[in-house]
Amino acid sequence: MIKIYDTMTRSLRKFVPLTENTVNIYVCGPTVYNYIHIGNARSAVAFDTIRRYFEYTGYQVNYISNFTDVDDKIIKAATQAGVSPKELSDRFIAAFIEDTKALGVKPATQNPRVMDYIAEIISFVESLIEKDFAYEADGDVYFRVEKSEHYAKLANKTLSELEVGASGRTDAETALKENPLDFALWKSAKAGEVSWDSPWGFGRPGWHIECSVMATEILGDTIDIHGGGADLEFPHHTNEIAQSEAKTGKTFANYWMHNGFVTVDNEKMSKSLGNFVTVHDMLQTVDGQVLRFFLATQQYRKPINFTEKTIHDAEINLKYLKNTLQQPLTETADEQELKQFVIAFQDAMDDDFNTANGITVVFDMAKWINSGSYTEPVKSAFEKMLAVFGIIFEEEVLEVDIEALIAKRQEARANRDFATADAIRDQLAVQGIKLLDTKDGVRWLRD
């Protein structure tokens, strides 16, 4: 039985899906104006692991993670780069996909983009105005926070406790509002900015409305799980709840999950401290699987500290697990012992996806395997556990097999059977083997 720590109730709750054997998850994705940093990677890896464990236990998972491709930061970065916002966002969406693939993150069921939902966003805002939850002011549209019952319940705050500047508001914006806490649903466009026509003039969506619309359009008025980084709890997720529930009159999400922060050498990551690390740069020197394994060593809600030592430790531990998988199979293993490992693993992961405890079970099992208990059922169970963490080792092609295929290719070439020769080259290439035809014969290397 899976239990989830729900940020809304500040408690551990049994997971009960809206639809039996199916879980709908929406996770806030990146604002695509730069390469993602290790903090973004933590969110991607954490929720990918959660998704994988749901699948491990037999759930069908609809996993939605958006790309915010309409935002002030994108407009500013695009202007500085001399390209359109779409060109910039396309570039960094491709980079995000490449980086997260290197981290072993499975593709989402859907990756909606804000630009594809402008009409739906306008319709959503119109509905809020009709219900008197929103108002237009000089081409902008704002949400009436005071009309939202229990506003900021997710952040466990009251209206009086909230700071006026929590969303980075300017004096000009505040002057247009009925209440300084009201937030923008639609922003009027400045000259030359990307914009769309609307009943309130040309403009673009506010940040918070984007996720509400994409989540409800794809998954319905109520979703099982909404997730993201702890920094999104307020104001982003708080405002999503307010506007979504104002429109539908229904609970927006049944469970709210937030992953913890990443520190670098026990300091908050920031550009001013010079410890801001992008995944793109890190992957030049650190294997993606090592980075992923490091991110799994702490339970998703807890902070995790990035250091050279923690990465080195992750690399050593991964090698140990890989060597364990390559042990020769044995004829027998204690089936009851195997069953106990599986139960212990599930108990750990059922407890709010406690990867730290789950990994402890994996290493205990590896020790047992290395003592001489490694049948096919044991190997299968072990591989399935590792796959929950996104750890999937490709079996290396043995040298004897490579040489045999090269000999077969040479024979085909001698017989002028170039189709077979090319097919063998392609087969080896897929397996990471590159052939070099030299005057001294064929050389090969692992790509």
UniProtKB/Swiss-Prot annotation:
UniProt cross-references to Pfam families, sorted A to Z: CysS_C, DALR_2, tRNA-synt_1e
Q: Does the keyword Repeat apply?
A: no
State the species of origin.
Streptococcus pyogenes serotype M1
Which superkingdom does the taxonomy of this entry point to?
A: Bacteria
The EC category is ligase
* Motif window: 'HIGH' region: 30-40
GO cellular component assignments: cytosol
Per the similarity annotation, which family is this?
Belongs to the class-I aminoacyl-tRNA synthetase family.
Q: How is the cofactor bound?
A: Binds 1 zinc ion per subunit.
- The primary location reported for this protein is cytoplasm
Enzyme Commission code(s) on record: 6.1.1.16
Q: What is this protein called?
A: Cysteine--tRNA ligase
Provide the transmembrane region boundaries.
Answer: none
One GO biological process term: cysteinyl-tRNA aminoacylation
